[in-house]
């Protein structure tokens, strides 16, 4: 039986994370995030997820189908058949070398920039990896174009993760100041169940990390380091590609454009803070809004916006306003399909 990874899978995984964050924030605000509070949060998240799933299933028509972005989980095997094996091998060797260089040049010193401790040949490895990735994408596609294009997104996500991981790997203790404050707060909540006073902001990230910590046994320290870089690497390339394909037909150019976006500053995605996580959701909301075509997708945008509001109002309020404007726009143009 073939398994598929598609946009529905990405939507649903994002929905689950948002529901855990939002339900956990509400439970923590009015109760606590002890074991009972975590259990209540998970039950609420599961119930809401089932309701959303039923809503999607009931209203899923050819026009509202989300699974158009579909490719096999075994697509790397197919990618080997449609791409140059030497290019792929070279890319993974260079990618591994980049991570190795980062791990062997960690420092506990207070430095202004990670480039102070990284050797010059890291830039050579990174540049060669980027060039080979561009060659893989630009290479003439084989017989199964869809599988190759979608497999390339996985490679781009790996490249994004490498790019977003430089700081949290090099700074062995941690990067920035806010991250330490938030981690200390979450450690206290994990031990005591709550910390007073309870604000109306930050709770979305606190609840998400603490609940993930309790159900996966991954330390809060590691979750606090990896959350935003990992989520950004997974969801940003897919969301951007999905939006671009709705506007431009040349899929190869769209993929190359996603890689090119790395030339812009991406400091929001190199460490986990409530503001950075909320900004990530806001960016995802904007790209999802560009392709919103049915009520289900609009509801998902509202869910992401409310979650962003529970994490950091600076990004949450614009997210809510964008969702409202999107509703007015589609309502006026009668573009939203039930």
List PLM regions with ranges.
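Short juxtamembrane and helix-loop transition motifs at transmembrane-helix boundaries
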Residues: 2-7, 112-113, 185-193, 216-219, ...
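Membrane-embedded, hydrophobic transmembrane alpha-helices
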Residues: 1-69, 75-145
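Extracytoplasmic catalytic/substrate-binding loops of multi-pass membrane glycan-assembly enzymes
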Residues: 171-185, 195-211, 217-220
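Membrane-interface helix caps and helix-loop-helix hairpins in membrane proteins
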Residues: 29-32, 168-174, 222, 265-275
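Membrane-embedded helix bundles of polyisoprenyl
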Residues: 16-25, 156-163, 205, 209-214, ...
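Hydrophobic alpha-helical transmembrane segments of multi-pass membrane proteins
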Residues: 10-17, 169, 173, 196-197, ...
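Hydrophobic alpha-helical membrane-interfacial segments at the cytosolic entry of transmembrane helices
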Residues: 334-338
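Extracytoplasmic loop-helix module adjacent to an early transmembrane segment
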Residues: 149-194
């Amino acid at each position: 039986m073939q398994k598929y990874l598609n946009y529905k899978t990405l939507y649903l995984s994002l929905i689950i994370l948002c529901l855990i964050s939002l339900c956990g924030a509400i439970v923590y605000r009015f109760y606590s995030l002890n074991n009972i509070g975590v259990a209540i949060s998970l039950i609420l998240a599961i119930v809401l997820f089932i309701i959303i799933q039923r809503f999607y299933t009931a209203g899923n028509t050819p026009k509202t189908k989300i699974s158009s972005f579909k490719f096999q989980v075994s697509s790397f095997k197919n990618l080997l058949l449609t791409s140059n094996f030497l290019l792929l091998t070279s890319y993974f060797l260079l990618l591994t070398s980049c991570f190795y260089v980062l791990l062997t040049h960690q420092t506990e010193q207070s430095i202004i920039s990670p480039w102070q401790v990284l050797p010059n040949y890291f830039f050579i490895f990174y540049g060669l990896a980027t060039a080979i990735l561009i060659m893989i994408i630009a290479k003439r596609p084989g017989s199964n174009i869809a599988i190759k294009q979608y497999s390339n997104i996985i490679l781009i996500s790996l490249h994004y993760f490498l790019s977003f991981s430089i700081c949290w790997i090099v700074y062995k203790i941690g990067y920035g100041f806010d991250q330490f404050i938030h981690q200390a707060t979450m450690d206290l909540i994990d031990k005591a169940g709550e910390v007073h006073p309870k604000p109306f902001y930050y709770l979305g990230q606190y609840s998400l990390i603490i609940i993930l910590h309790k159900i996966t046994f991954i330390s809060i320290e590691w979750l606090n380091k990896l959350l935003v870089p990992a989520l950004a690497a997974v969801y940003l390339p897919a969301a951007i590609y999905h939006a671009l394909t709705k506007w431009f037909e040349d899929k190869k150019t769209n993929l190359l454009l996603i890689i090119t976006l790395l030339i812009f500053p991406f400091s929001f995605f190199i460490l986990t803070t409530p503001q950075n996580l909320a900004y990530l959701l806001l960016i995802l909301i904007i790209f999802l809004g560009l392709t919103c075509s049915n009520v289900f997708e609009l509801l998902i945008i509202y869910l992401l916006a409310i979650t962003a509001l529970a994490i950091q109002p600076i990004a949450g309020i614009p997210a809510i306003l964008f969702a409202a404007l999107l509703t007015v726009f589609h309502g006026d143009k009668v573009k939203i399909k039930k």
